[in-house]
Amino acid sequence: MGIKGLNALINEHSPKAFRNGEMKTFFGRKVAIDASMCLYQFLIAVRQQDGQQLANEEGETTSHLMGFFYRTIRMVGYGIKPCYVFDGKPPVLKGGELEKRLKRREEAEKQRLDMKETGTLADIAKFERRTVRVTREQNDQAKKLLELMGIPYVDAPCEAEAQCAELAKGGKVYAAASEDMDTLCYETPYLLRHMTTAEARKLPVTEIDYAKVMEGLEMELPQFIDLCILLGCDYCETIKGVGPVTAFKLIKEHGSIEKVVEAIENNPKSKQKIPENWPYNEARELFLHPEVIPASECELEWKEPDEEALVDYMVRQHGFSEQRIRDGASKLRKSLKTGTQGRLDKFFVVKKRPAEEKKGKNTKEEKPKKKRK
């Protein structure tokens, strides 16, 4: 879910941290992508005209496979080398948030069934999107597809966005790509948003520079993490009555959650309520010391797609068009070869042009000589 209100807060205090650009501007970059986020995104967005998910003749959902296949080809076509990272086991602290999500899905499912009786197709589709959940089988199917496409993936021991950030910090990739703003809490040098959004939506890829975020907020990592916990994260609830503006003000004034709590408890006029048995310190530790595979132990290799195996998997097993799968495999193969070209900024240091020498007041410009007739 990310951090509530963080994007707007950074935009206000660190506007220079944002850079919007077309996908092609990341030519030659390796990017670690939150695959678990992609799975939800594809299952929600990749639909038929009637709003139903794509499915094969057996009724098995294939929206996620189509999403991974074509969005990956699109990125590689722009010279980007994607590496996908899948979620592992969720932290114990996240149990409360996951339970809330389950209840929301159950409520949406009830509303969806009611809508089938009285609602329009648009109404039914809206509630169907809210009931989406990713199964273990869909995870495994996506991994199998990526393997056949020659695209590397990593199974994170815990949170996918933390592992993406670790790969970026360790120099294995340029940036972490996720819609979750809490990826910044794991110190990714760069966070890319809208990387896997449908091309039809025409959303620019947003690059967020971690160093510039810290510079604009005038914070170090511990204060930033405490700010994010106050704003609201997946690991614990926050202080009632504290919104983004107040949270920022409190951290700037007191420097840590401990001192914020102390100030609130010592102020009899305060209307803010500290949650009972608030595990903010445990949440902080999850951000400061996430469970990840060290980047040095991750070997990422991009290979040629196995076209025949892809056809067998996508066409014979999942009902896709053979011609489209072969065309996609061909495009992927050509793009991977093109993508081996490096970025020019890896080889050259761009220097500013020297300023033109200022002409002194007493210096006379030489006039062009007149031609003799």
Swiss-Prot record:
Top-level taxon of the source organism: Eukaryota
Cofactor(s) required for function per UniProt: Mg(2+)
Pfam family, one: XPG_N
Localization terms from the record: Nucleus, Nucleolus; Nucleus, Nucleoplasm; Mitochondrion
Residue numbers binding Mg(2+) 1: 34, 87, 159, 161
InterPro entries associated with the record: 5-3_exonuclease_C_sf (IPR036279), Flap_endonuc (IPR023426), HhH2 (IPR008918), PIN-like_dom_sf (IPR029060), XPG-I_dom (IPR006086), XPG/Rad2 (IPR006084), XPG_CS (IPR019974), XPG_DNA_repair_N (IPR006085)
The record's free-text note on cofactor binding: Binds 2 magnesium ions per subunit. They probably participate in the reaction catalyzed by the enzyme. May bind an additional third magnesium ion after substrate binding.
EC numbers: 3.1.-.-
Region (Interaction with PCNA): 340-348
BP term (GO), one: base-excision repair
Enzyme class name: hydrolase
Keywords annotated in UniProt: DNA damage, DNA repair, DNA replication, Endonuclease, Exonuclease, Hydrolase, Magnesium, Metal-binding, Mitochondrion, Nuclease, Nucleus, Phosphoprotein
GO molecular function: 5'-3' exonuclease activity; 5'-flap endonuclease activity; DNA binding; magnesium ion binding
Keyword Hydrolase among UniProt keywords: yes
HAMAP family (alphabetical): Fen
Function: Structure-specific nuclease with 5'-flap endonuclease and 5'-3' exonuclease activities involved in DNA replication and repair. During DNA replication, cleaves the 5'-overhanging flap structure that is generated by displacement synthesis when DNA polymerase encounters the 5'-end of a downstream Okazaki fragment. It enters the flap from the 5'-end and then tracks to cleave the flap base, leaving a nick for ligation. Also involved in the long patch base excision repair (LP-BER) pathway, by cleaving within the apurinic/apyrimidinic (AP) site-terminated flap.
PANTHER family the record matches: FLAP ENDONUCLEASE 1, FLAP ENDONUCLEASE FAMILY MEMBER
Protein known as: Flap endonuclease 1
Gene that this sequence comes from: FEN1
